[in-house]
Amino acid sequence: MQYKEVAGGICAPKGFAAAGVHCGIRANHSEKYDLALIKAEVRCAAAGVYTTNKVCGAPIKVDRAHLTDGYAQAIVVNSGNANTCAANGVALAEECCALVGKALNIDEKDVLPASTGVIGQPMVIDPFARGIPAAAEKLAATAQGSTDAATAIMTTDTHKKEYAIQFELGGKVCTVGAIGKGSGMIAPNMATMLAFYTTDAAVSPALLEKALKTVVPGTYNQMSVDLDTSTNDTLIIMASGLAGNPEICEENADYAAFVAALTAIAEHMCAEHAGDGEGATHLITCEVTHAPDLKTARAVSRSVVCSNLFKAAVFGRDANWGRILCAIGYTPGDFSIDKV
């Protein structure tokens, strides 16, 4: 399938605007953006996947509740405070949604919150009460709007992460855009990262969720930097349907093409996350061929890229390929090491 890379990030698809502002969540960073807002013109099919950590951030609990009907219209994200292990965390996340709902004149239940930053720190509503109206006023359906939002969600990242591609569905040009953050606490099974996708493809909520959960295991769940899985990992997608393609309501050729496009953009974003790992000087990718099944292939690649011994060899430019065999050897699964 052919894809065309386009500018605009999450604002490249039809029907989306974004903004980033400084509102004071990062008290010691007087100018740094720390609040992002993404808004859709229409109520969108939406889906999300989240951390596997048993300790999860309060925004994730709110997201799960708000996404029970499969629809959303806005996303609000802060950096600098994870809103995790705070006594008032869920109430504060809900209050943020109410502020967004009021500022955008939409149902607060159609707002999805996300947070990233320090775990266990107190959090108050005052910065949000200032920042959300300011972000709503600044919303722009432009490349700059996407860039500002991508910048606002950064923590230890060294650069912003955004991408967009176009492809064809049902004779219509469709676009998928993404922004993300995360360079530390990254391990298999989603790890310290936030990612927000927008698309103008028309996809039913059920098929959008299925597509997302099909893509994540082979992309985000295979990514590793330091083997720490965060409490706040979140990947959310909203689909406006404004491209005008026939709505994808069954697993047909258009569905397969949509999954392929999502996979392509997810692979690009994962490379951005891993390549920007805290202290990283190399980006390692592992391709497994002739495995007996997909489960084994993923397990082998995960063992290799997670091996600290192998990472040390790569860092030291030491061609110690025995460390690869060692990592393969302790992988669960039935395969012949003699064929490696």
Which ranges hold each PLM region?
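A structural signal for small-residue-enriched, beta-sheet-centric alpha/beta enzyme cores
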Residues: M1-A91, E95, G101-V340
